[in-house]
Amino acid sequence: MIYKIFYQKDFDQVPVRENTDSLYVEAESEADVRKKLSEKNYNLEFITPISGEFLAYEQQKEHFTVEKL
């Protein structure tokens, strides 16, 4: 399954909505996503699975790439 992750790049900073980035990761579960991203210093805000029409919509965006972790 593909997950969309909303995050702040610096864990030590207070989250600011305008600085939120997103990335896509293929994983078995939300816990697997957290495990794969644990070595990065990201402040994970929200993790959501995407599929079906939502995935098709996201794939149309020019910045859509699934990270290989």
UniProtKB/Swiss-Prot annotation:
Report the EC number(s), separated by commas if there are several. 2.7.7.6
- Reaction(s) the record says it catalyses: RNA(n) + a ribonucleoside 5'-triphosphate = RNA(n+1) + diphosphate
A Pfam family reported for this protein in Swiss-Prot or TrEMBL: RpoY
- UniProt KW keywords: DNA-directed RNA polymerase, Nucleotidyltransferase, Transcription, Transferase
Name the top EC class: transferase
Name the domain of life this protein comes from.
Bacteria
GO molecular function: any one? Answer: DNA binding
Gene Ontology cellular component annotations, sorted alphabetically: DNA-directed RNA polymerase complex
Q: What does this protein do?
A: A non-essential component of RNA polymerase (RNAP).
**What is its quaternary makeup?**
RNAP is composed of a core of 2 alpha, a beta and a beta' subunit. The core is associated with a delta subunit, and at least one of epsilon or omega. When a sigma factor is associated with the core the holoenzyme is formed, which can initiate transcription.
- NCBIfam families to which the protein is assigned, alphabetical: PRK13667.1
Query: What is the protein's name according to its record?
Result: DNA-directed RNA polymerase subunit epsilon
Write the lineage as a comma-separated list: Bacteria, Bacillati, Bacillota, Bacilli, Bacillales
